[in-house]
């Protein structure tokens, strides 16, 4: 913003006129010289001296020239002695050629602290132009603190419009005031409520309803009937969307756990605006396990109409749907029980201490534990010594259900968990009802005393072999091998019959496979095959490390262990030398 020095300011230092462009200020023949002489009726001003280092022309100021003082436009000139006559050579100096008229503005001149930018065009002292009005006061708020700022701005705009040339401007060096502060926008981008109601949501709701196309918010007289804590929730004849109940109201009757649903149906004189009524059903809780409602006034049909029923369209003009003006009809007190009661009800549902008596067969069906039923002939002749499977619990007493088939035996049956079966009836089946604070829900049986000793090993050998399972494992064992060795002293069993037959040759000593070269007999064909390789010299198995070949795979495996030991010793040796940290190994060396 261009600012001029006002009246009463101290006399500035002789200004240095910097050439911006075109004819220099003060040069003979310039437009400023001609217009100034015509306006004041005086001769042209003396040419101001220039600093040698400010212009690349290298011109030196004249010794007799005196720098004129700064004069505002319209200010009467003080009486002064006539300027000294200039030499004829200087007065008749021709106009500078167009090639030498170039801009002399340097970027370093902007960094000078005492440089004041002034837009002075060639018509600085000319009369103000009639076409351009004066600058309004609101357009120059930053220059009001400076004397004569408004006049200067008006002069600057008028002179610029009169001359039409914005190229000529100069810097006036000297003590200059601090530049005016920059303009800043102090507006607000948020919505301010009425000072009397700083947190009134009506203004925001009216704004949003205008955007979303909803009905306007009711007046403050309708909201006056509500409590102060209910202010964030809409009420009135135009409250189409219900809000959640107040969680922090003084009376806990309006609790956040509605029993069936809550409604907001204030519509007086305008039944067409009462459009929707929310019906929120409680979560899916079995009616048999749900706590009774807090009041008989609750309609069970509407309470359990459906899980979270959607918005239902009400009949327009139906009686009882619309209330009085500004009446916020919440659900009755029975639908909003005390929050403490509701918490107890929820705890009683989620963590029931007592449940209604339900038959045990409902919770535990009869066929729930019929796992791996066995036929009597599956285990052979020694099946009477094997333990039985788990007895499915029945609903009435200790008697077994009809879902499982068990082996007939005079000895007490054992379950897969190592427990006595309920068919033995040695001890009653414990229930949750026998435990204090519980009711008749069937529970797993309590571990009984240790089981009786097992039958003889002979009967067990003729049945299923223990295999990898422990001696106390009585699971159905689908991985058990069905073909056991018939020899009493042998406990081997096999999954395939050919494996059992090959095993029986060990007991009988039968060797049906004979070598044709040496007539040696073998009980297994693979043994004969490897034996023949000793005669033929065939060695199909080679070592991966040293390349040594072997006739049998087990020989190669035994030989590979030698290399593993050598590699371990070599790594220990390299680790002692410090090479192991570099990632070297025996194989790479």
Curated annotation (Swiss-Prot):
Start-end of C2H2-type zinc fingers: 483-507, 513-535, 541-563
Compositionally biased residues, Gly residues: 395-404
GO function term, MF aspect, one: DNA-binding transcription activator activity, RNA polymerase II-specific
Primary subcellular site in the record, as a coarse category: nucleus
Alphabetized Gene3D superfamilies for the sequence: Classic Zinc Finger
Triggers of expression: By PHA/PMA or by serum.
UniProt key word Repeat: yes
GO biological process terms, semicolon-separated: positive regulation of cell population proliferation; positive regulation of transcription by RNA polymerase II; regulation of transcription by RNA polymerase II
Primary role: Transcriptional regulator. Recognizes and binds to the DNA sequence 5'-GCGGGGGCG-3' (GSG). Activates the transcription of target genes whose products are required for mitogenesis and differentiation.
Family: Belongs to the EGR C2H2-type zinc-finger protein family.
Record-given protein name: Early growth response protein 4
